[in-house]
Amino acid sequence: TSYGNRGGTYPGEGAREVANNKVFFWDMCKQKGVSYRTYGEFVSDGKPTLAVLQDNYCRDFTGWDESVRDTVRFYQWKRDFDSLLAINAVPRFNTVRFINDHTQGLSLGRPTPFAHVADNDLALGMFVDYLSHSPIWNETLIISVEDDAQNGPDHVDANRSVALLAGGFVKQGFVDHTPYTTTSLLRTMELVLGLPPMTQYDAAANSLWRCFNTASGHPPYRYR
């Protein structure tokens, strides 16, 4: 009903308490002593929607507001990251949301879908560039997925979308044709962080092990 503008509220991101349990990924991190931080994800009106994020979110990072460019969000993240890096306190698990791949369609007075996606792509490139020049690059894994795969279904399969990996141990110039799911990404993050599976679904999922080298040391990335 929300999607069709017939009433209702957005059901995700902690908006409905009845749907929330205690097994979000952040809850598992907290239980196992893995530090974490969120930038925009599960944050509404400048406040986290889950108690587990209360002291683990960036207050200066803009949440869901499509009037704000993702390149602006990059600089918001950068300031916070630099402050944490300076005191050796960068959390092990971070979620960063650049939203403008979602676009606003052909809404009057708003940037075109091409402009929104270009802004989103540039912000992601700046993000990878900056991390790749940081002292923690060889210990970093970036997993990037689309919020929604826009502009219609994929030309091969409507269930298919893009996933990008970057990091010191990630193979360069490698295209993996293994049929992964979003749960595969979740399983990979669990293995990297030393977390147990949260459900039978991620326990049974294929991890992205084919995408990694046994040694790190890639040159820094530069966006263009």
Segments the model singles out, each with a brief description of its role:
Residues 1-224:
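N-terminal pro-sequences and low-complexity stem/linker regions of secreted or lumenal proteins
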